[in-house]
């Protein structure tokens, strides 16, 4: 009782093998009506590389040595689609987001990021409809993955429509560019932003005796007027566990930093599951191996 639900919304990219098997009746898949003969078209949902066959990174083996019924080492995609991190190549490297494909919000990336927002792009409508669908299911908020890789104009347009369904619903932006913080709050209409690049990064160094508290007042000063919009944390699925050998090896070392994170201003604070008991993120878990994290690529209990 009293528990609320915030779900992850990934607006920038989908899986390369994306196909919805649970969409409502009458709803078309992303890309279903795309003109794949051109690299960019404002009404397309994806970006394409006409005439080029997608090739996975050399020596990449899906699932490693593990066997699976779907593991036949074959994957056909022609024309190739652009990766989630904007790589216009049919042969992305292993460190690119090769297993994802970029969603097209009407931005012609190859033409100096020229925008085509009138008429409203198809991707805007489809992604807004997904948000509204879940708002109607009474979720309490969305953590928006890589929100800054999606045009702020989309958020300005979409968020009020979702809040018309539920005015109390909250939007949290994963964002790593401090110069865009105010833009995504004021124009984009987000409620909260990740406070990773400044406060988290500084506190991590402090926990390991690699920095000074002297940097913190300057960070807070740079956030004048928006401090209460910054979501503070010491752990999330992307970052290493405090108790992991790759971080501090002892979660009690982070106690002073947790006090700062929770009490430095009126911004919300996030505690990642297992943080309260010193989860060390130990053990190999698939793609990323022994990395001090829990579920960055692989989900386990």
Label each PLM-derived region with a short phrase:
Residues 1, 16, 99-123, 139-149, ...:
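The substrate-binding groove and active-site-proximal loops of carbohydrate-active enzymes
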Residues 1-133, 158, 164:
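Substrate-binding/active-site clefts of carbohydrate-active enzymes
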Residues 13, 22-37, 41-44, 48-56, ...:
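Active-site-proximal helices and loops of the catalytic beta/alpha 8
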Residues 256:
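Conserved interdomain hinge at the start of the Helicase C-terminal
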Residues 267:
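Active-site-adjacent structural elements that line small-molecule/cofactor binding pockets in enzymes
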Residues 272-275:
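Short coil/turn segments at secondary-structure boundaries
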């Amino acid at each position: 009782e009293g528990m609320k639900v915030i779900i992850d919304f990934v607006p920038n990219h989908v899986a390369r093998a994306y196909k919805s098997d649970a969409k409502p009746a009458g709803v078309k898949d992303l890309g279903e009506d795309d003109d794949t003969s051109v690299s960019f078209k404002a009404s397309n949902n994806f970006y394409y590389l006409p005439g080029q066959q997608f090739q996975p990174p050399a020596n990449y083996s899906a699932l490693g040595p593990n066997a699976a019924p779907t593991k036949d080492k074959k994957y056909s995609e022609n024309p190739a689609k652009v990766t989630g991190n904007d790589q216009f190549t049919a042969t992305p490297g292993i460190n690119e987001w090769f297993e994802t494909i970029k969603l097209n919000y009407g931005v012609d990336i190859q033409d100096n990021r020229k925008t085509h927002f009138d008429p409203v792009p198809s991707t805007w409508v489809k992604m807004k409809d997904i948000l509204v669908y879940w708002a109607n299911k009474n979720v309490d908020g969305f953590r928006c993955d890589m929100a800054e890789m999606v045009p702020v104009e989309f958020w300005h347009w979409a968020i009020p429509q979702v809040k018309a369904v539920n005015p109390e619903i909250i939007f949290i932006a994963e964002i790593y560019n401090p110069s865009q913080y105010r833009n995504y709050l004021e124009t984009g209409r987000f409620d909260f932003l990740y406070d990773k690049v400044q406060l988290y990064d500084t506190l991590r160094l402090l926990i390991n005796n690699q920095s000074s508290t002297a940097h913190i007042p300057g960070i807070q000063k740079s956030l004048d007027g928006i401090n209460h919009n910054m979501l503070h944390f010491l752990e999330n699925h992307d970052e290493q566990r405090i108790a992991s050998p790759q971080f501090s090896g002892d979660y009690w070392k982070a106690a002073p930093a947790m006090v700062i994170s929770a009490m430095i201003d009126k911004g919300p604070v996030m505690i990642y599951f297992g943080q309260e008991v010193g989860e060390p993120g130990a053990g190999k878990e698939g793609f990323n191996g022994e990395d001090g994290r829990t579920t960055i690529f692989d989900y386990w209990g």
